[in-house]
């Protein structure tokens, strides 16, 4: 009987310890997630800059200094530092990097150890060259009418070819017929007039001899009577 009450209270103590360990593990996991969220938000606040872009600062320095041969890196650096005081600690390195980048892109011109802005005359020239390129495709539609007008020439050529072919065919067809049929006819026709000419020649001299004898008698008889009277 004495053994039963000793074994009963041991079971609830083990369950309480397990529950305490579970709550501690849950409490430790919560702050780790919060730290990750805070670390992601911090870089956004650092990205804002209080000064304009490097191209604006450099172009402003070159235009205000107005040097004939261009402004050196030292002069640009000094001008920007005097005007903009909230600059990063590595401003000089960044300035050199951006100067090289702008020269490579064509926004700046490097002359020996100085930098200049591109000439104002060279900038509008490409703009003027681009404007005429836009209307050219529209004008290109006009030659289409010329091409359409050129089509009748091709038709005329085809018609000329067809006429030439028809003429050649027409010439070939009659050339074959007269060779067989007309070869014998001209001979017979030519032979008949020869006979007629001979008969006419034979008959004509007999008539000519009889006619003048009669005319002489009739003409002379009245003339002799009148003279005698």
From Swiss-Prot:
PANTHER family: HISTONE H1. This is Histone H1. One of its GO terms (cellular component) is nucleus. It holds the Pfam family Linker_histone. SMART domains: H15 (SM00526). One of its GO terms (biological process) is nucleosome assembly. Belongs to the histone H1/H5 family. It comes from Euphorbia esula (Leafy spurge). Keywords: Chromosome, DNA-binding, Nucleus. Residues 125-138, 161-177, 185-205 have a biased composition (Low complexity). GO terms for molecular function: double-stranded DNA binding; nucleosomal DNA binding; structural constituent of chromatin. Residues 32-45, 139-160, 206-229 have a biased composition (Basic residues). Residues 50-119 form the H15 domain. Residues 1-52, 125-229 are annotated as: Disordered. Histones H1 are necessary for the condensation of nucleosome chains into higher-order structures. It is found in: Nucleus; Chromosome.
């Amino acid at each position: 009987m004495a053994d039963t009450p000793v074994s009963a209270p041991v079971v609830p103590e083990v369950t309480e310890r397990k529950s305490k360990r579970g709550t501690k593990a849950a409490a430790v996991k919560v702050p780790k997630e919060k730290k990750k969220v805070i670390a992601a938000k911090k870089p956004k606040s650092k990205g804002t800059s209080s000064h304009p872009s490097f191209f604006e600062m450099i172009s402003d320095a070159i235009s205000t200094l107005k040097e004939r041969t261009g402004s050196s890196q030292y002069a640009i650096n000094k001008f920007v530092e005097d005007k903009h005081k909230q600059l990063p600690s590595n401003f000089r390195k960044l300035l050199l990097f951006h100067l090289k980048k702008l020269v490579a892109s064509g926004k700046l011109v490097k002359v020996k150890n100085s930098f200049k802005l591109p000439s104002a005359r060279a900038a509008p020239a490409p703009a003027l060259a681009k404007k005429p390129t836009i209307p050219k495709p529209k004008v290109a539609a006009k030659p289409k009418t010329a091409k359409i007008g050129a089509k009748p020439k091709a038709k005329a050529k085809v018609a000329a070819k067809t006429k030439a072919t028809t003429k050649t065919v027409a010439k070939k067809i009659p050339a074959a017929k007269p060779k067989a049929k007309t070869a014998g006819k001209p001979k017979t026709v030519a032979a008949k007039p020869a006979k007629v000419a001979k008969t006419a020649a034979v008959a004509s001299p007999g008539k000519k001899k009889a006619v003048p004898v009669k005319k002489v008698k009739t003409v002379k008889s009245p003339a002799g009577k009148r003279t005698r009277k």
